[in-house]
Amino acid sequence: MISINIVGEVDSILIESILELDRRITINSSNIDPNFIIVYEKFDEYYTFLKEFIGKIPIVIITGNTSYSRKCYFYSLGIDLYIIKNNESKSLILCRILNEIKKYIKYVNDDFIDFENHQFVFNNYLVNLSNIELKILRCLYINLGRYVSKEELKKGVWDTEDFVDSNTINVYIHRLRDSLKNCKEIEIINERKLGYKILIRKDLC
């Protein structure tokens, strides 16, 4: 799942165009943490909100604030795209936003898991994994943006809830994290009682 949040002005044409890009995309879901944020602002009303997410996930700002120093400041923080509304047409703004989303989708496609050769490939980073580790990785990926419980992993990886205890899952998650430790763009986090979640960070591998 690719969760995109649109903050501020909501453009129906933009929403339709985004949803056409990939069937996995959801917009403004209350159940999934965002993987990508688009902010429409008049001047500076989302400054605090933006600082919380910049550098963690891709962010696009479309603003009426014409300050060049502010634009430079946000790029220095790691913003992905900063568009001043008055400088560009609506159609061009739409194209630029969609192109940025396409770049992100490229990072989260299924192609990085090669079951036949037991390999994981991401941004030129390659590691050999066991079949179980690959299945866990894929199970976390297809649920991108939300926690996957141990019960879900048992069903998705082992196709059973029997004969697989929590310790077995913990061991495989530990091995998977250890195998991926050199790829800083991929992180597996866990939350007590919720399960495990995969984070894909941009431009770090």
Swiss-Prot record:
Pfam families: Trans_reg_C. Residues 103-200 bind DNA. One of its GO terms (molecular function) is DNA binding. InterPro entries: OmpR/PhoB-type_DNA-bd (IPR001867), Sig_transdc_resp-reg_C-effctor (IPR016032), WH-like_DNA-bd_sf (IPR036388). One of its GO terms (biological process) is phosphorelay signal transduction system. Gene3D superfamilies: Winged helix-like DNA-binding domain superfamily/Winged helix DNA-binding domain. Keywords: DNA-binding, Plasmid, Transcription, Transcription regulation. It comes from the Bacteria. To the C-terminus of E.coli phosphate regulon transcriptional regulatory protein PhoB. This is Putative epidermin response regulator. It comes from Staphylococcus epidermidis.
